Amino acid sequence: GLPTVGNPNNYKYDPKIIYDPEQDRFICVLLNGTNQFNWIVFGFSQTNDPAGAWNFYKLYGDYAADTTWFDYPAISITHNELFLTGNKITYNGSWQTGFRQTVIYQVKKSDGYNAAPVLNYQLWDSINPINNVYIRNLCPVLGGGAIYGPEQYFVSNRNLDIQNDTIFLVKIPDTIGSTNTNLSITVLQTPLAYGVPPDGRQNTTFDNTIEDLTTNDGRILGAFIESDQIQFVNASLNTGNGSAGIYHGVISNVSSSPTVTGNIFSVDTLDFGYPNLSFSGNQGGNTSIISFDYTGPNAFAGLGAIYYDGSQFSDMLKIRQGDSVIDVMTGVQRWGDYTGSQTYWPAIGKVWVVGIYGKKNRGYGNYMAEIGIPSLAGVANEQQKKNAGKVFPNPAFDYIQAEFSVSTAQQVDFSIYDITGRMVDKLYTTYCKKGANLIQFNIAPLAKGSYVLKGVNTDGAIIMTNKFIRQ
């Protein structure tokens, strides 16, 4: 028979939970053990009380007896079904080198809700490789403003590549038992390439032995579909400034002739990791709230978010700033593997998020918050107050003037960035006197669009950062 759960490898990890607003129930998936002791555990709440009774099931991880186990679960739901994806890893192999393939479980929700003796499910494995390379890490696409189906989409990329422009769109078209059962893979090409992100820098001001926070890779970690459009996020290198940024992709015309575009949000003095996103309403376009962990050489690890209004990003909101560095192991510090994000169904526009921050004892702190569009829309105004600077005229065609104040005389480097965080013009370094300063810049060579003028002193402190529009 199969190995029992009673063994030294008996520990639980990677819990994933989702609320079903149509059935007013909860579904949970978690893993138990590794190698030959690996089990996938499914839980379905009997009522809308997650503290109440549940119906539990388990499936053996090494179902094919090929010395692989199931790792890194991700879940989504349609009207009738639960979808679970994960990676098959060889016994005693690392997640990097032991990867064999990604598989999909398609499960009837009603079996779990009704306490059926066994779960009725379909397993999708041996998914066709592209150029002899298996797709790795399929991220299920959640419904944005509602639960959809019967079709279920998944997205993926080449998460370990230094640079790549390929996005995979995978579709399971119908329910278990349907005659329409052909899984399809569409290979898309994005104009803006992504790349495996660097590890997150930590603040070494008080201890120069502190190691970086690992970003793992650039896999897609969150996605939703609304109005025939998919939005997704992953961590990526920003080649413009060398930092770890957030790659935000948009797949349009999903059901007919899909195309993909991408932008990168980054801050040169910060590194971002483990992003997620949720739909936050339609105000002339599908909006979203993107949350992520952040860290930097001048900041302790914390939890942040931005708002995407359908065309551009807001400034960054620091939801929970860290109290200290993270230092719990030898060498590079673990940072992931997830953050959480969930649309608040009773009030679309609000999102619940959870992530990591550095505690005073140098350990991991978890922080959960409800945020909404008003919280993020006010970030730009708050930052304007902090830097007490302004740019005028705005919009402008040829010249802008920057007015700001500094507390001491100092040298300041001025640069211009586009809305993706890419530096487009390093202007010059100039001496700024104590008190008020007024400096003029030529913006005529810039293409029309929105930009950010940033001034940073020799210590790396941001003196001013102001948006402007080149007409």
Would you name each region that the model predicts?
Residues 373-392, 405-407, 422:
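Residue-level detector of functionally pivotal "anchor" positions at catalytic/ligand-binding pockets or at interdomain
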